[in-house]
Amino acid sequence: MADYSVTSESENLRLQMRRMMDGLHVAMPAKVLAFQPGPPVRVTVQPATQMKITLGEEVSYRSLPQLSGVPVVLPFAQTAGFLLTVPIQPGDTGLLVIPDRGLDNFLQAGDVAAPPFYGDPTLIQPRGHSLTDAIFIPGLSSDAVEIADYSTEAIELRDRERKSYISLGP
């Protein structure tokens, strides 16, 4: 049987930090379950990673919960009014980014959000690294998804096999 006893204060601190980091969410891959073209544009996703659960000496893993109403990040020059949209469908994958602070104030006001001072009645919720604040960036894929004939000299709008494309280059 393994000995899990803590031998020093520094070892105890390292163990506590590891446990804290295990629960910290920053970014992870996710799969689209549903797409709502809006307004506002949102997805329902299933995070493609699992959570480690340690109870004493037992370690198990479980899926993170589905997330609905997740904002989608698209290239958007707001002041010029230009936007690039892409078709998003169930089964597509991308990157979930979990912000340092809650997005409620920013999403509602559309401007710079105040810092999360605890006890401030103007703030909805002063939380950080919460899955409820995730944003989705479409396009992250596994190495199994091949992109044929990738151009290193031009910007292209194309299908994966490059059968249909528009190329802008020097």
Residues covered by each model-derived region:
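Hydrophobic packing positions characteristic
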Residues: 2-170
